[in-house]
Every structure is written in structure tokens, then in C-alpha cells.
Amino acid sequence: MKGRGTHAMSSKKNNLPKNVSVEMVDPDAGIWEATATIDNGDFGSRTLRFETGLLARQADGAVTAYLDEDTILLSTTTASRSPREGIDFFPLTVDVEERMYSAGRIPGSFFRREGRPGTDAILAARLIDRPLRPTFVKGLRNEVQVVITVMSIDPNEMYDVLAINGASASTQLSGLPVSSSVGGVRMALVVDEEHPEGQWVAFPTREQVSQSVFELVVAGRVTEPAKGGRGKKSQPNVAVMMVEAGATDNVVERIAEGAPAPTEAVVAEGIEAAKPFIATLCAAQDALRDAVDTESREFELFPPFDEDVYSAVEAECDADVAQIMTIADKQERDESLAENMQETVDALIEQFPERESEIRAAHNDLTRTIVRQRILEDGFRIDGRDHTSIRDLGIVVQLLPRAHGSALFERGETQILGVTTLDTLKMEQTIDSLGPETSKRYIHHYNFPPYSTGETGRVGSPKRREIGHGALAERALTPVLPSREEFPYTIRQVSEALGSNGSTSMGSVCASTLSLYNAGVPLKAPVAGIAMGLVSGLVDGKEKFVSLTDILGAEDAFGDMDFKVAGTSEYVTALQLDTKLDGLPSEVLASALGQARSARLEILQLMEDAIDAPDQMSELAPRITKISIPQNKIGEVIGPKGKTINQITEETGANISIEDDGTVFVSAVGGEAAEAAIEKINAIANPQQPKVGDRFLGTVVKTTAFGAFISLLPGRDGLLHISNIGGDRRIEKVEDELNVGDKIQVEIADIDNRGKISLVPVDED
């Protein structure tokens, strides 16, 4: 922390990279701090600090992480003292707590306190979990909880990648059995006048991201150092574990101005550019761990099975499983595999009493081995395809008659229904988070009901996985959406996963493009997505990598990589990668990207055959007309306490939204209602001065003892005196002839020097 003396670490300091330091900042309290400096060349440098010993001392591991000075978060890692019984998985939980005080704000909820995590917090938690989970030793069954608390944030910064590093650092100090530290970095390809070809900037600010064409988050760990040449210091090898990437909102406009398009080659360059920064961050975390001298704790491990069980299972059912894994139909294959597993359990349970879970785990591992071996040695996939083929595609557009847009996209047994709903800008989603956004115009929701996999389960509020898949599809489509000015609608896109056997998120991208076109949304370009996989292993003593196009669910589970790529025919709009390997060779990644592009182009062609341009908007969708009024007339159009605008809405049935710059959006399902509302708005904002002799069909808005006030135009009333109401007859009460809301034909008889209008009735005959 600031204001304290420092005490340099005496050991291992000379072995640190020059941009990493570690020191004791308070010897009495035992507070240590490691610092990593990120050099961005022309774009300056960033400083990340990891401090331990001051906050949350009772947690197993606690680190306060700083990005420069103003962005601070606390990461804690805590483990239960005993294993959780009755489970066969590692119970890791990652929670992100966004404290509104970190931005100097009070929560907008009724109780004025933080509630359940918002979308940003959930996505950040997933971003941390994905690279952190694989570092834990297999067989751990103790509950582990990582909690990230955002304590201070610069409004121009993003905290999620700092949280990846903080979570890894606190886990390193917890004494838990992990293989290595994890470093995470956000990279943005910033294009400006000084860098027309773009420069990759690490830990960019929000302002720098707005100047970029592509951003990506890369997480990885350091493996064995690479061998340096004679006289050269060896450089660490960085194994990429996770990538989350997407094009920026303005990528189409920036490319038109001459900026480089984020092609597959450019994306691969960005991933490579991230590796030195990851190595620096891992070095800082390791230095802090070594300085604190954390003791490793002993944990009981529960391997899924012992070798004797696996050998028995292999001897019992190897040939049967090999035959079953040639069945192309998912349901038939799953049923046959389940039956074979039960038969194997029945056959071996006497030999291995009370070890049924081991038999089942060994059966699963045998299945995995058979599938991988066939792919590597024979080029044979479960459903008979080669490694570059796409499953059969099916497309149906305008499936739902009352929806504004809909489309069904099928890829093999994966079936996605995309549904588009359009509404006025008043329906934008209000956002109460730490980010600068206060509203969102494009909303993408993804639903994954249990019946999509033939199972039962909970339905209702979305799970973290559904929120993550929806965010990925949203990221893929946002760069090609029309601007507010071009298309002044709020767009809600829903992806219904009706059947799942591999990459429903990429199926959602395809279904959404088709549905948006069907709704009449003028996309800048169609977008399609494909899921890739990877299987690696030794064949004839040599390491072999096989990239798989359009993976099945089983290939996802048994493979080494889940790699999703979405984009147009020209560039990538979204990418997500998770790998289980210690390292992904650059040439393998480049090959997989190229293979994904070929598949994407094939899918885009089939989508174009189904619908190649936006359809006419549905008659059920609101028609929105945009007009402009002088800013000094906004108050008159709204009226006191909204009286005038509410009156126009009530009389015409149109919805009206007024922006601060005088832009007015008028929407109605029927065109006549919108035209009537526009006419009334123009009458106020650009009025024609009423003159004696003008006639109007007015509305009674108020009655008094001396007459009735008649609304002629919005904001302009006239008085029909009681003496003129009855014609030749004398009336005692205005209400005997007229009441509020009545329509009456009147003529302007006089306008005095104060602008007061006197009216006389007009004989309708």
C-alpha cells in the first residue's frame, strides 16, 4: 500500500524478468507486493500490482490486485477442510461481486443495495473459471470458492482481466494443489493516424478499445522454458488456455476508412502478441508466491478409477464400445452405450465390490480413448464424416406467424429457433452496472431447456452457461447491426435451443442472422458460426494434431479443444477457444482458423440461398418514423407534466420518444396513427399561426361557468363563450350542451392583442 517503507526480497530477485519486481512493503505486518510492468510502446505502459498480507487475512489465499492506481479488486481463495461426499467432479465456484461504491454510486434497486450478480459479473466469473479450473490437480473433491470483490474502478477501465490474474494469484497463495499460475491479458488492435495498420495494445482503456477494430482476452500459463540459442537467454513457453474475442461495434466503418480487417491471420497475430505479457504476469504471481513462501497443504485425492478396474473394463467391452461408437444417431448411440455400461457393471461388480463408480468412470475413459484413436489413426469420426465435413443443414424462414421475424436452423441433430422482436427505443434494456453503458439496444437471450438433450431438469431463470452463450452470439452479431440512426428500433433476439448435439451457440448465430433478415433488419453483412475441435496424440512416435470441423457433443467432451468462430465472409466477428493442451502450436491454430473459415463460407452460401436480403417488415411490427424539431420546442411538445405529449398519444394511439437533440421517434402499428401524431407535433414545433376565419374540429378540454375551452391544436386552446353555445337559445349551464371530450366544429371569431382566441360554433350543415 502507499506510504510505507519497502524491504527488498533477498532471494531469487535476480532471476526475475526486468519488468517484474517483488518486495516487502511492511515488514511488521508481513505485507508483500509484486509488480508487473506492461510496455505498450507508443501507447505507454500499464502497471499491475499484487499485494498480500493486508486484507482478508483469514482466507486461505488473499490478494489485492491493482491496475495502475484507481482500479482495485480483492481476490480470495478458500477451500473446505474435508472432501465433499457423493460427487464425482471438482466443486469449484467463482463469484464476482460488483460493489457500486467502487464507482462512487448507490445501487438503483428499491433497497439500494447490490442483489444477485448482473450479466457483467457472471461473464467475468466464467472468464476466470475457464482457465483456472484446469490448473487444479485431478481428483480434488474439496469445495473451493474464489471470490472477486471489485472495490475501486476507473470508469475508463475494465476489471475482468485483472480479476483473472488476481484469482490465480490468490489461489497460488492458498496452498491448494495447482499446476501453475495463470496470466490473462486483454489485447486491442488500435488503429489511429500514427498506426494506420494497427498496433496490439495490452490492457487497453475503454477509449482505446473504441479506437480499435478487434479485441481479445487471452489466458495462459508458462510451461517449460524454450531453449535459447548460444548466448541467448531462454524464453518461456506460454500455453494458451483460453481466448475470448470479438470485433468492435464500429469495425465495418473502420474497415471502410482503410483500417485492417480482423481476418483469421490478424487474430492469430493478436494471440501470439499476448504471450509475452502472459509470461510477465505469471512471473509476478510466482515471485509473490515464492516470497511469501506458501506451504502446500495435503488434500485427499479421488482418482476416477484404478488401473486394475480399467484393464478389466477394457477386456470386457472394448469391441462392443468400438462398434457402438460407429452409430451415427445420437439418441440410439447414447442408449446403446448406457446399456453396455450397465452390462459391464453387472459383469464386473462381483470382482470389484463397492467400486461401481470406478467401473463407470473407466467405461467413459475407454469410450474416449476409442473415439480419439479412430480419429488420429483412421480419420474416422463417430458419424462417419471426414475431419473437414459439415453435417447436413436445414433452414426454414418465417416459422412463427405472429413473430416479427423467425427462422429455424438445423445442423445435424442441433436445432435452433431464432425469434426477433422489434420495439421502440423506449424499450431499451436499462443497465445498472459498473460500466459506462446505461442502456442496451440489442438484447440477445439464449435458452437451453433440458429437453434439448432428452433429459429432465430445472427450467426458469437462466443459468450461467445460458448467459455466456447468449453473450457470445450477441458479440458475433453486434458489429453488423445497423446504427440507431439507420434503424431506430430496440431489437430482442431469442435463441431457443430445441435440440443439442454440438455447438448450439454457433447455431444460434446462424439462426439469428436468418431471423433478423426475416424481420427486416438491414444487417451490414450476414454472419455464420462454426464449432471446431482438436484431437492430438502420438502416432508412430510422432505428435499428430487433427482439427475437426463442426464437432458433435461427444467430440467436444473427448477432444482437446473447443474452438468457436463466427464471422462474415470477410472477417471474424467473434471467437471463443478453450483447450486442455499444455501448448497449442501456432501452425495448428492457424490451420484450425483456416478450416473454420472454409466451413463458414459454405454455411453462409446456404443461408444466402434461403434469404439473401432483409424482408419487408411484418405488418405486426411497429413502424417508426423519425422527425426533428427545434430544441427550444421540446418543452412545448412535452407540455406541463407531460400533458401535451400524453394528449397526442391518447388521441392518436402512437408512441412518442423525444431525444435531447430534438430527434423525435413516432411509432405505431398502423401508419395512419403515426401520421396523425406527426401532424400534431409539427403543429406545435412548426406552427402555422391561427388567424380569424380558420375552422377546426376541436375537442372540449375544460368547462367553466362562462364557457368552454376548446383544443384546436396541441397547446393552442380557444374560448367558446356561453352566450355563443346555444345559438338563439339562452342556456344556464355549459354542461347542458357540452362536456369534456366532446368534439365540436368551431371558427376563430377574434384574436386579441394577447393572443387569446375567441370562438363561435359552426353549423355542420
Swiss-Prot record:
GO terms for biological process: mRNA catabolic process; RNA processing. InterPro entries: ExoRNase_PH_dom1, ExoRNase_PH_dom2_sf, GPSI/PNP, KH_dom, KH_dom_type_1, KH_dom_type_1_sf, NA-bd_OB-fold, PNPase. It comes from the Bacteria. SUPFAM superfamilies: Eukaryotic type KH-domain (KH-domain type I), Nucleic acid-binding proteins, Polynucleotide phosphorylase/guanosine pentaphosphate synthase (PNPase/GPSI), domain 3, Ribonuclease PH domain 2-like, Ribosomal protein S5 domain 2-like. Its cofactor is Mg(2+). Involved in mRNA degradation. Catalyzes the phosphorolysis of single-stranded polyribonucleotides processively in the 3'- to 5'-direction. Belongs to the polyribonucleotide nucleotidyltransferase family. This is Polyribonucleotide nucleotidyltransferase.
